[in-house]
Amino acid sequence: MLSTDILERKPRLRAIAALVPEDCQCLADIGTDHGYLPAALLRAGRCRRAIAADIGAAPLERARQTARLYGLEDRMELRLGG
């Protein structure tokens, strides 16, 4: 079970997070938008690091804000591109 509140109101993302193995070394979230999925998994200790990618600069900026909010800048790599 995910021990974080980030996904509390996001049932679709909770379902995806449940499929990630406990010993995930690196998660790639393509189309990350706000970066909630990688942030939740990093905070819960389910993944060591994550790559959050999006084709839009605005969504990636939201992911950057999420990473900053939770102090994950050193473990959540952000990539812009398609």
Model segments located where?
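Conserved SAM/SAH-binding beta-strand->alpha-helix loop
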Residues: 56-58
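A structural micro-motif
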Residues: 25, 45-48, 74-76
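Conserved SAM-binding loop of SAM-dependent methyltransferases across substrates and taxa
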Residues: 34-47
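Conserved SAM-binding motif I beta-strand of class I
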Residues: 49-54
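Conserved class I S-adenosyl-L-methionine
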Residues: 24-33
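S-adenosyl-L-methionine
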Residues: 1-25, 39, 64-82
